[in-house]
Amino acid sequence: MNNNTKKITTTAMLAAIAYVVVVVGRIPVVLFLKYDPKDIIITLGGLIWGPLTSFTVSVIVSLIEMVTISENGILGCIMNIVSSCSFACTAAVIYKKKRTLKGAVTGLLAGSVAMVLVMMLWNYLIAPIYMGYPREAVAKLLIPAFLPFNLLKSGLNAGFTFLLYKPITTVLRRTGYLSESAVEQNKKPVGLWLFFGAVIITCILLILSLNGVI
């Protein structure tokens, strides 16, 4: 399989997986806001194959969502792309420049901050248009709804991406789909595994609490 064919196949595979997890994995978080894990797939693709892969997959998945399951039209599609890219592409760009454990952690943390800041601004500017709410009403939801949602979303994205990266790249190398030089070989310290695991557990507990389950 030549490089161009492999890139097309990889992009299509990631887009298909990301779309499936959107369809089957939507979780209510706060009010009308739902979390889906597609950004984990998109970010893993970017960390392994570069930020352009993250961008391409996020566009493809968002367009498919728009014409199948989304009710928010083109503006909702754009919001999806901006949200995914602000996290995934930020992480992938930083990791591409520094393919080390520190680079991966820095990228994920920077992606989390970027997504929260970008989406707070975009929710204020764009959400009133496609939601049909007055901007004043949306502004009142920024702190009690949009901020915790984006913090939880970025926490889950960063945590699962970190924990899944090594196992997935190991499988890809063993199957010959990824060269040994294509990924960083450093082992993840136990402390970071525990940290990101704790982040995931905390986010899940908060979501359950917000939904009145616990």
Where are the regions that the model predicts?
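Loop-helix junctions at membrane interfaces
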Residues: 1-214
